[in-house]
Every structure is written in C-alpha cells, then in structure tokens.
C-alpha cells in the first residue's frame, strides 16, 4: 500500500510539472506573438492575446491548487503561500488592451490596497462591547440571552484541520485559521478549572457596573502592540485570523490603553493602578475624590484585580506568540518592503523587554531568515533589521548574542558602518556595541574583515560624527577582551590598548603584548611613542624569572632598538648595564633562552644608531663601552668560538666602536695582545655569509693599523687569499661577500710583496679582467654590489703595479697590458673610486717608463754578411724600417712594454679627470701627469704637449675648485715647472690669473710647510714678492 502511495505521489508530481511546463510554453508563444504586433494591428487581436494570457494564468492557478496537502507537512506555511498564489492566479484578470484602462485598473488596485476597511479593528465582545453604538443595557440583554458567554471566551483552537477546509472548498473566515505555521512553545498556562466553572462572580459583578467604554479611544500604539496587525501583515492570507483581538475589559478608562496592573475601586471600576493614583493625586482634598467613570465619591482604597491581570498576561502571551508566527511567515515570503518592515517592527515590539519572547524568536528560526535582509535594497529595511537585532542581543545572557554572530554574516554588518545613510550607520554601531559585550561575539567581530579598521577610523573622525566616534570607542574597549583584537587595533593605528595591557596587564597578557610588538608594523611617526610607553614594562619583564616573559621582552626590545631614534630612550631607561650584565655574567636561565645573543643584538643596534657611546657606563665600576674591560670581553667571546648569531652581533659592536679613534686604539691594542687576528681571519671561511661578511668588514677597518700583520696571517690561512677572489658568471649574481672580499684585498697594504706574490696567478688575473669586462658590458643590469666589486677588482690590479721591481709583477703588467686596462677604466666607469684607482695605477706604471724605455740598438751585420745567399733570398728589406723614438722618454716606448702614457693616449683622459668634482680623482690624475714632468724626462717637450692640450688652464681651474693641501702641492709644483722650464710665455699666462694670485697669497699665509714654500716660490717668480740674491744684514 505504501509503495502504491509513493508511486502515485511521484506520478502526481510529474503531471503537475508537465502541466506547468505546458502553460509556460503557451505563455512564451503568446509573448512572441505580442512582440510581433505593431500599432496597425487590430484591437481584436490584442484582446485575443490578453484572453490567452488570462487563460494560461488561471490554468496555472488550478494546477497549483491540485498539489497534495501531504507535500507541505514539514513546512506548512509554504502551503499557505501556494494556496494564496493559486487563488490570486485563478482570479486574475487582464485588461482589454486599452492603455488608459489598464492604468485605471492599476490605480484602483493601489487605492484598494490602502483602503482602511481591509484592516478592521476587532475586539472581543464576550466581556465588554466594543461597538460605541452598542449600549451597556443592550449588552446585558445580549449577555442574558447568551448565558454560555458569561465565562471568559475560549481562545480559537490551533488544531483546525486546514487540509479538510481545502478539500471541501470551505474558505470562510471562521475556518481560515493559520495552522500551517509551526507552533511556538507558549508561556501561558491554561485557565484554572475554577475560572472555567464560573468562579469569577466577584470580578464579573464588579465588571457589570462599568458602563460601555468606546473602543476607538484606545491608544493606537497599545492596539498595535497587543492587538491588531499592521495593514501589510493583515494582507497575508489565512494568517491574520490567528490573532486574538483585545477584550474591552482590558482597556483602562483613564489611559485608554491595555492595563498592566489592573486595580478595582470601591465603585467596581477597574483601571490601571498608576492612572488611578495620579487621578487621586489630582484632587486636593480626599473627600472630593470622584470615580472617573460613575462620578461617585471614592476613597483611596484599591484592590488588585489579580484574575484580570492574569487573563491580560495570558492574552498577551498568546497574541505575542501569534505575532511571532505571522512575522515568520512574512519574512519567509520576502514580500513587499512595507511587509518586511512591519514584520520587523512587530517583532521588535514583541521582544522589547521580554526575554521569553526573544527565546521564542530564536527557537522559531527567525534569525536565520534575517541574514538575507542585511543586503536588502531598501535602507529602511536594513535600519529596522539592525534595530531588531540589537533588541534580540540586549539581554542578560549571551545566548542571543552568540546566535546572532553565528547566524548573521558579520561582514555585512561591518559594511553598514560605512553606509551613507546615517541612521543605518548608527544602528549598525549600536548593534555591534551590544554584541561586543559577549566574549564569543568579540572574537567573531574581530575576525570580520576590516571591522576593527573601520571602527578605529570612526573613532578618530569625531568632527564628522560624534555619536559614531563615541560608540566606536566603546565597542573597541569591549573588543579588548580578545588579545587578537588588540593586535588588530595596533595594526590599524590604535596602539593605546596594546600599550595599556603591556603596562598594567597580567604577566601572561604582557607576554602576548610584547610578542605583538614584534609582529606588527608600526609607522615611523609612532615608534618613538611606543618606545617611551613600552620600555619600562619590557625592562621589568627582562628582569623576571619567567623564561617566556624574558624571551618575549628581549625580542621586543631588539625590535624597538632597530629604529635608531628609539635608542636614546633605551639608554635613558638603563638598558646598557642590563644588556652588558646579560652578556658577561653567567645566569642559570641565560643559556636556556640565549639571552646573550639577544643582549648583543640590542647593544649592536644601539651602537649603530650613532650615539656618543664613549661615556656610556656598563657597570658600577665606571667602565664604559670604549674601555679595555668591555673591548677585551667582546674580543674574548669572539675568539672563543661563540655561536654564529652571537659572533655576528659581536662583530657589529666592534665595527661601531671602531668609528671612535679612542675605541679603535683600544681594539687594536687588545687584538695585538690577545693575538685574535687569526680567529677573525678564520671567520672569513665560515659558511654563514652574514658572519663572513661581518668579519671581512672588521678586517677592512683594521687594515690601516695592522695591515701587514693581517696580510701575513691571511697568507698562512688555508685556502687564502685566492679564495677571496670568486668571480660570478653573471653580473647580477654579485653578492655582498664578493664585494667585501675584493675590497679587503684592495685595502691591504699594496707594497706587501708576500700577499702580492700569493695573488700572482695567471688564472686569478684573467678572472679579474673578465669580471671587469662583464660588469662594464652589463650596464644597468647588475647587482647592487657590482660597483663595490668593481672597485675592489681594480684595487687588486693597482696593488700589482706597486711592486713592479719584482719580475713576476712586471711580467704580469706587460702580459695583461695593464696600461690599456687603466686607460679604458678612466672613461668607461661612473665610479669616482675606479677613476682614482685607475689614475693611481697609471702613475705607478708611468713612473717606471723612463727606466724601461731604451734607445734603439743598431742591428749587427757581421754574421749576416758572412753568409753567401742569393740576392733573392736576402733577409734585408729593400727599405729600412723607421723606428720611432718617444720625444719625452728619449727611447722606444709602447703602452704595453714600457707603460708610456703618451703611447697609450692617456694624457687627454687624465686631463679630463681634472674637471671631476671629487678631489681624490683630481689629485690622482695630477699625480699621474706629474710623472711626465720629472727631471729625467724631456720636460720642455712635455710642457709643450700639455700646453697644446690646455693643461695650464685645467690645472688652474682645479686649484680654484679644490683646497686640499696635497692637491695644492701637486698643482703648485706643476705650475712652478711651467714657469721655470716653460719661459715667459707660460709665466705671463699664469700671472694674468688674478684668482690664482689670491690663492697663492692665501696658501703662503695659511698653508703647511711644503705648500707655503711652493706658493712663495711661485710668487717670487711672478714678481709678486722680492727676490734676495744676498743676505742683507
């Protein structure tokens, strides 16, 4: 039997769907036909199309009505909707095609919707008449004829069989109760058996003396709250009849509102207690008090009408439960905007101040229906929804709040904080304020994307919206219950909660806040403020015995110290002594958390900030950061194989101290005393790149003081120094270690023959030249360290030119044509240091040219003449080859073999360097040119060549531009050469430069010994000073 029923249901459903599908197809054809019509088409065709549409709609309505009742057992309210839609479709009419008539029909429908007759105010007549035309005597006669009505009327049953009504077609009002809506548990209790059996004689006898009170004078809000539904909700089919109208006996004759605490006077009139008391107070004399209804004299004695109060309360409970059902149906349907608004308002009035009704709303599943209305197109709907949600959340327990945050999409609520409609914006903030009182809700709000950022923004925009600012501030204070929210506030720019909990919270909270300080990115403008507020608390945690607290505090302090302006604050709170004690004093739990590493990091950050550290005391004995005590302990730790991370910070500390001459002298002294240079050189080979780079930088800083010692020990280290030259395949692969390694080799003393010989290797020099070519060719496609690497490589080549007396160095310079390499580098680089080094290399090479240049030797012919060979096989050419002699060096010269600057075309490039802004480049170029004016060469020829290249003016311009003593000495020496060896021509040109005369006078007055002597000589030769041939006594 069950199988047959299931099969029939399936067949029935298929028939229904097929029928609906056929109707839709017919409707589509009618639409196509209507679209094809034009203005010339006859009215008859239009009416036929309309009639076709009307038939299709009615057919679909009949099909919907045939859906079995069993389909909606679990969700009966859907059946109500389907039946309502079916009735409307069956009664649907379509106009006759006339545009004006259709408009009139539409206007009539709209006006019909707003007709007040549709929503009739109803009141039960069992206790008191509700019609003002119905007199009290008539009512008594009616009561006697209806003896069964003397008791309190029965509440309409909820068990009416609606399915039976549908089946038999009986749709009268008396039978159209809303049974399809799921029942909501009621708080009301059944009326006692005494009340059922007529034991209300006393209250009834008192009530019969009260004259008729017109129901239309009742307060409208009271009627709305406890009685009638709104117009839009009353339009719901088969729903409104479930509402129980208010009884006339419930209305207070004074306030015209439903009574909350009814009391009966001695005249038998029942009124609201507070209203009666106010009525009594309005009389000055108690003897003049009259009944407000009967006019009889009264005393102030009142008796509580407990039975009526109970009846009113139970009536309210029943109607409130019914209102919840009606609102559930309205929100489920998602009808018109007005219907949704009225449903939300009814729910709010029903739940306001009544915890039980809020529970009923939650259990009825209404909250689940509300989420979609957060994105409703109407701002009024969103406003009412937010108000209602706030009402649900406003309760003593957190159940309502938790259900809201679990069900409602919090991101939608957060978006409404930015609404352009101020009421919506304020309602959203009020809801969040109420929700934020719950711990669970605080977590959910914090996880909503952008929630805290928008609240922080609103808090700071007090000028734009003071209410939003104050409310957001309260919400944020509530959200502080969740530590993760505090972190988000700090990330959004609100740091006070984090700093406040760090300063005053429990130790566990302080640890969490300290960890957040490391994780968040604080703007530069607030880092100093954070340091001022956080450092005292962090110092306290550092001195705690809790390992987790100490670890978090050390990391936070290290993070704070990275911002250099903060370090002054750290020094003021006494961090130096605490960190030094952590580094030099053994503690039981120091090794457990590597506090030495953290302390060294903080000290290194402080020293790198550039503070004057020489006066910072490290202990109570007066030792400072630059003292032997501190430096010795640092180097001792570095020498004794400390962990790599600690060694990195120790090297950073020494590098910072090396910037002070006094501290540098101490470091050099301790290194020599402890022989720690070997340990530092060994660190170069460490696989940790950062440690290796740090060690190389420290060795570079020590080079001017113990360079030869470092060179000797570097050569004794396994794999060194050749391993320091590692040339990458591509220019963009150059690392910092490549650059500092080459720089160390370039900075070590150039005259150290041991190191130079260790570097003389055909493959090494070839790699250097290849790397230089690679960098020049790559242009902008290079690493950030490419320039430093290039400077180091050129410096290594220059060091080879300082020991050319060694045959291997001479062979290397000739074989690789270093002269041409340096000449090319003068112009093909943007680095001033490379230019300076290239000019220095040319100077070193050119200083040997005179020695290497030899006059051409006559070829011996004795041996060749003794050979008798045919004339055609003679080795002598028919024309002797002319050998050119260098006019300056008086011999055979070449750029490759004798390093002649003239043959290498280097003079013009060196003179161009005189126009550089860098004094070091100009000085090196002058030094290279000076080799052409040495007494061993043909000075006159050199002067003539330089004069043709405008060298005199370039030298004078360099003197005017730069004031360095060593540069002035070289420039004055060259000018003196031009005056002495060049004759009056050059002397006249030089003497006409007035600025030069002033500079010579200034150098004569304030220059050092050599510069002053040279200036004096030039002034004498220019007749600016008297020349004494004999001593005058």
UniProtKB/Swiss-Prot annotation:
Locate the region Disordered: 145-226
UniProt record, GO biological process = protein ubiquitination
Q: Spell out the SMART domains in the cross-references.
A: ARM, Ubox
Keyword annotations for this protein, in alphabetical order, are: Repeat, Transferase, Ubl conjugation pathway
Pathway noted in the entry:
Protein modification; protein ubiquitination
Stored InterPro entries: ARM-like, ARM-type_fold, Armadillo, RING-Ubox_PUB, U-box_domain_protein, Ubox_domain, Znf_RING/FYVE/PHD
Sequence ranges of Polar residues compositional bias: 200-226
What enzyme class is recorded for this protein? Answer: transferase
Reactions catalysed: S-ubiquitinyl-[E2 ubiquitin-conjugating enzyme]-L-cysteine + [acceptor protein]-L-lysine = [E2 ubiquitin-conjugating enzyme]-L-cysteine + N(6)-ubiquitinyl-[acceptor protein]-L-lysine
What EC number(s) does this enzyme carry? 2.3.2.27
Q: Which domain of life, per UniProt? A: Eukaryota
PANTHER family given in the database record = RING-TYPE E3 UBIQUITIN TRANSFERASE, U-BOX DOMAIN-CONTAINING PROTEIN 42-RELATED
Q: How is this protein named in the record?
A: Putative U-box domain-containing protein 42
Q: Which gene encodes it?
A: PUB42
